[in-house]
């Protein structure tokens, strides 16, 4: 139903606008310490989060571990809203821990070529991009606007 879709989009836009002042305070300022080549613009990785690489994603998947891929950038307002409103909530973090989900975060702040290639492989030209790779089964691409319920529903094992 288009009306529901427009309603959700409008709600997301209003939430982003309400959070914009606080999010801009967290964004890197021009002239601030430049991001390093290995870990551009984002703050330190949260506990339980690792830096993204396709090799690490393959290794975790081959070991039967569920993986949540979070492709983001310091300048991406949608990414910042999703982090605050969906990914970093107590409920989402508790579910990630409960199901043993490992998060791999890719920082595209300075357009990392390896991340660009990964995005293109999945038909995307930019961030945010979210991918859940279950321990067994096909990967699931999540929408660009997240909610805690959507993330938790996606990572919850359906074979239990």
Predicted regions: what they are:
Residues 1-100, 104-160:
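Proteins that catalyze or organize thiol-disulfide redox chemistry
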């Amino acid at each position: 139903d288009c009306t529901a879709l427009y309603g959700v989009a409008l709600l997301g836009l209003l939430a982003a606008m309400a959070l914009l002042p606080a999010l801009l305070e967290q964004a890197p300022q021009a002239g601030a310490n430049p991001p390093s080549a290995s870990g551009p613009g984002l703050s330190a990785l949260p506990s339980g989060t690792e830096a993204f690489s396709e090799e690490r994603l393959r290794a975790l998947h081959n070991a039967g571990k569920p993986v949540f891929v979070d492709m983001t950038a310091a300048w991406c307002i949608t990414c910042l809203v999703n982090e605050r409103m969906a990914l970093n909530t107590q409920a989402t973090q508790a579910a990630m821990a409960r199901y043993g989900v490992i998060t791999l975060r890719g920082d595209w702040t300075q357009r990392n070529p390896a991340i660009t290639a990964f995005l293109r492989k999945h038909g995307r030209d930019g961030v945010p991009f979210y991918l859940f790779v279950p321990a067994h089964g096909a990967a699931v691409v999540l929408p660009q606007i997240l909610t805690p319920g959507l993330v938790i529903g996606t990572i919850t094992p359906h074979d239990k």
